[in-house]
Every structure is written in C-alpha cells, then in structure tokens.
C-alpha cells in the first residue's frame, strides 16, 4: 500500500491533484491510499478529504490575518491525520504560504515532500528558496524556465510539462449550450471569470459586472462557478450589485471559455486555460490596498498575466489595481468581440503561448510524468 498525502488549496491545484492521483493509481505497482486537503474534484478522484479547500482559501495579506485562527485549526487537523496515517510521501500543490509551513512540519516528521507547481519565487520573495532547500525533496515545475531556476539554487527539480498544455475540450454544439442555459445564440457570448476564492470574487466581480453594464444587452454574459465556490453564494454576490445585467451562471469554466467570443478573466490559472483554448481575454486583478502596497515592494515583475510572463511580452492586456476600471475592461472586451485588428493580434499572440506550453511534450501526460517522480521519491531512502 502506497500512502500519499496530497494537498491543494485552490481550484487549479485541485484539478492537478486529481489528475496526479489518477496517474499514480495507473502507474503504482501497489494500491494507492490518498488523503489530504482539496475539494470535490479530488474527492471524486478517490482522495479522502480531511480539510476542505473552501475552509482555507483566502487571498491577500489582510484577508489571511483575519482568518488565521480557522486556517491554523485546519492546518493542525491535517497534521494530526498525517501523524495517524504516516504517509510514504506528501505532494503539496502550489498554495505556498500554507504549504511551506506544512512542508516544514512534514519534514520534521520524516515524510518526504514533493512540491508540484512552483510558487513564483523567481518573481517575488526569493528568500523563500531557503525553505525549499531545507524542506522539499523535489520540485516538479510546469514551466521550462523554472527547472533552471531551481537547479541554479541547488534544488532537485524536474519540468513535467504544463497540464494545461494538453488541454482539449469537446465543444458542445452552440444551439445545445444555448438551450441548456437559455441563451440567445445570435448574440456574442462574453465569459466572466472573477476567480476561485470568495474574497477574490468580492474584490473583482463588481467591476466586471459594471463593465458588462457598459457593454450593454447586445451580449450574453456567462459566469462559471469555480469548484471552490457554490452557485447560491455566487448568485447572492450578483444580487448585491445594483441593477446588474442578465448574467447566466454555468457549471463548466472551460466549456464557457471555449463558447465565449471574449472573456474577462481574473489573474490565475484561468488565464492559461483561456490561452490554450484560444479565447481572447483581458486579465484583471485587485487585492486589498494593504496587500497591494506590501506586494509591490516585493514583486520583481513588470507583468502579472501568466501568458505575458510565458511569452516575455504583452500578449493580452492586463488591468491591475487602480488601473482595473469598468471603462477600461469594457473598451478592451469590445475590441476583442469585434472582427478587427485587436482581436486578430490577440488570437495570434495566444497561439504563440500555446506553443510554449506544449514544448517538450512526450507520449506521457504531464500528470503521468509527475506521478513517476512522486513514486521515485516515495521509494528513495535518502
């Protein structure tokens, strides 16, 4: 029996964790018992969820401080289960502030730690590399440049490929999708993706809805509900906004993106998904002012959107903090809806990003390559 602790605190990490668990079961010569932190996708993949990701998913320094007692309690709940089950290996997926503390605690218990999906140490708070050096057995990274970064810092690292580089979606017939959600197939459809955490949505959604108001009723607006949230809560957020336009909640972000003519997307994994699926979008983001002031002192980047970082230049427009206004979002989305030079340029740019993400692919999936590394670490005696 191979016992694995898997921890993913966000929707994107949970998606990678579920795929990794499937790959582990496929490749492991022994039965796999998995437990940890996650949500419905990981539960469906057979992981015994000890801590639900909804209970620890907060964003920004000010927000984290407000929820520290609850997060502390869930942290120790997970550790108690690790003490009871004694896993052969732990896989921590992104979510660095929580996971670096967890890595330290697991290391002290003699449990080897594999970190899957690197925090952006190359962008900010590089001092955290010391935590990786001390407590992480191996880094599994999803961007090629990250492998070199870690090796330069004497950390064992492997580029497994980006799971989303393999992303393909069977596109539902437009008429079928329209009937399912009561949409007008003659109108352009615009995706609204405000993030996967409650505080994030509360900071971002009102401005996106204001942008939709400015764009007007000539479009249909689709809002997929992340697995870390629920439709009732999201509907309540919409109802709290004065005179919102008609917004349709959907259950599948990828299908929503591939069906959308253009999209407004919060910074994060959804920007990579939109790039791979070829949906033109504008990236937006906002955090609490305190979080922003502290973050700007630490971040070493001029760009924030992952597609822009991958390409090394602006491929999509990014509107962050005070630059994130309804007028600017509406203007960019309007240009992306129209068959004009802006839409054509962004589509060309996104094709280049897809090439970067798909480079170095083999016959194995990214999850399978990651699973082989996890199995190797679990079997090592060093």
UniProtKB/Swiss-Prot annotation:
Catalytic activity, as annotated: a lipid X + a UDP-2-N,3-O-bis[(3R)-3-hydroxyacyl]-alpha-D-glucosamine = a lipid A disaccharide + UDP + H(+)
GO molecular function: lipid-A-disaccharide synthase activity; phospholipid binding
Any GO CC annotation of this UniProt entry: membrane
Keyword annotations: Glycosyltransferase, Lipid A biosynthesis, Lipid biosynthesis, Lipid metabolism, Transferase
EC numbers: 2.4.1.182
UniProt cross-references to InterPro entries, sorted A to Z: Glyco_trans_19 (IPR003835)
GO biological process, one term: lipid A biosynthetic process
UniProt pathway: Bacterial outer membrane biogenesis; LPS lipid A biosynthesis
Domain of life: Bacteria
Functional summary from the UniProt entry: Condensation of UDP-2,3-diacylglucosamine and 2,3-diacylglucosamine-1-phosphate to form lipid A disaccharide, a precursor of lipid A, a phosphorylated glycolipid that anchors the lipopolysaccharide to the outer membrane of the cell.
Family: Belongs to the LpxB family.
Protein name (database record): Lipid-A-disaccharide synthase
Organism: Koribacter versatilis (strain Ellin345)
Lineage, uppermost ranks: Bacteria, Pseudomonadati, Acidobacteriota, Terriglobia, Terriglobales
Gene: lpxB
